[in-house]
């Protein structure tokens, strides 16, 4: 086999390389952010033009994708030690780390001004706060403290508030209720992840909640935060953001998830936590469908 043939076989194919660049943005997470941002717009009082709405949602996704790319850059050595992440583009060597760094810096420099023009300055500022909190605070904090759980929930809860402020131009009770709902939802969701991936996180040297506080304490916190999620989801009703159908749906979902969380306090092993994690995804999906239908 000639050198040229070997190089041809090992050279990255354009479509595969493009796919890896997209993977840096963690597209499933970015897609969820687009949905929650659009949900904030849908629920907000007032109107925003279709073109401005599309630009706002897309620019929000770009900022989130950039934050994820920077996270991949900063955690590339950690990802290489973890089974779940070692095949990501950077630890696998398919993308140069400085490409991820460049995209992570250039993309928000382009998208945040667009948010300011398509929506308003407040929405752009919220995007910047989410980006900086995720990259400069949450990402390094995961290596030092389990309280990173609560810090990381802040940027994750900002997108629906951005959708709200893009329409209203201000932060009020409705926007804060949406922020509170997403903040509360993330706590049991990520506690479950820290539990069923505890060994992998320990392998990577990350001080996630279950790795630091142990399995029983994590299950207790999962039950507590799931119970607190119920009033957070129902808070939208007295504010006039949702009707009776949503209230019934939120109550049933919240009680069912709380019962399952409580049932896991005395259990052991990661299978239950994995099932609970999937349950939180179903919970949020059905909740947002009910929200959309209630308007």
UniProtKB/Swiss-Prot annotation:
It catalyses: heme b + (2E,6E)-farnesyl diphosphate + H2O = Fe(II)-heme o + diphosphate. It is found in: Cell inner membrane. The chain crosses the membrane at residues 31-51, 54-74, 98-118, 121-141, 147-167, 173-193, 220-240, 245-265, 273-293. PROSITE patterns: UBIA. GO terms for molecular function: protoheme IX farnesyltransferase activity. Belongs to the UbiA prenyltransferase family. Protoheme IX farnesyltransferase subfamily. It comes from the Bacteria. Carbon 2 of the heme B porphyrin ring is defined according to the Fischer nomenclature. Pathway: Porphyrin-containing compound metabolism; heme O biosynthesis; heme O from protoheme: step 1/1. It comes from Anaeromyxobacter dehalogenans (strain 2CP-C). This is Protoheme IX farnesyltransferase. GO terms for cellular component: plasma membrane. Its EC number is 2.5.1.141. One of its GO terms (biological process) is heme O biosynthetic process. Keywords: Cell inner membrane, Cell membrane, Heme biosynthesis, Membrane, Transferase, Transmembrane, Transmembrane helix. It is a multi-pass membrane protein. CDD domains: PT_UbiA_Cox10 (cd13957). Pfam families: UbiA.
């Amino acid at each position: 086999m000639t050198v040229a043939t070997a190089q041809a076989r090992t050279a990255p194919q354009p479509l595969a390389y493009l796919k890896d660049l997209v993977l840096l943005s963690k597209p499933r997470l970015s897609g969820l952010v687009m949905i929650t941002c659009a949900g904030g717009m849908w629920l907000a009082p007032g109107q925003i033009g279709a073109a401005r709405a599309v630009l706002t949602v897309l620019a929000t996704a770009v900022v989130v994708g950039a934050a994820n790319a920077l996270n991949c850059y900063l955690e590339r050595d950690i990802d290489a030690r973890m089974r779940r992440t070692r095949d990501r583009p950077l630890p696998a060597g398919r993308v140069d780390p400085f490409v991820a760094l460049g995209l992570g810096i250039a993309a928000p420099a382009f998208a945040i001004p667009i948010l300011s023009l398509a929506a308003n300055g407040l929405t752009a500022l919220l995007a910047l706060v989410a980006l900086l909190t995720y990259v400069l605070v949450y990402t390094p904090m995961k290596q030092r403290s389990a309280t990173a759980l609560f810090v990381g929930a802040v940027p994750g809860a900002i997108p629906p508030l951005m959708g709200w402020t893009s329409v209203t131009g201000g932060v009020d009770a409705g926007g804060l209720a949406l922020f509170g709902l997403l903040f509360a939802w993330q706590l049991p969701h990520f506690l479950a992840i820290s539990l069923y991936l505890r060994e992998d996180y320990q392998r990577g040297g990350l001080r996630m909640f279950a790795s630091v506080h142990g399995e029983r304490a994590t299950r207790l916190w999962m039950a507590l935060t799931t119970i607190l999620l119920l009033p957070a989801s129902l808070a939208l009703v007295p504010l006039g953001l949702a009707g009776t159908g949503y209230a019934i749906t939120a109550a049933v979902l919240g009680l069912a998830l709380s019962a399952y969380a409580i049932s896991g306090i005395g259990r052991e092993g990661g299978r239950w936590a994995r099932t609970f994690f999937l349950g939180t995804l179903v919970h949020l999906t059905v909740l947002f469908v009910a929200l959309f239908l209630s308007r």
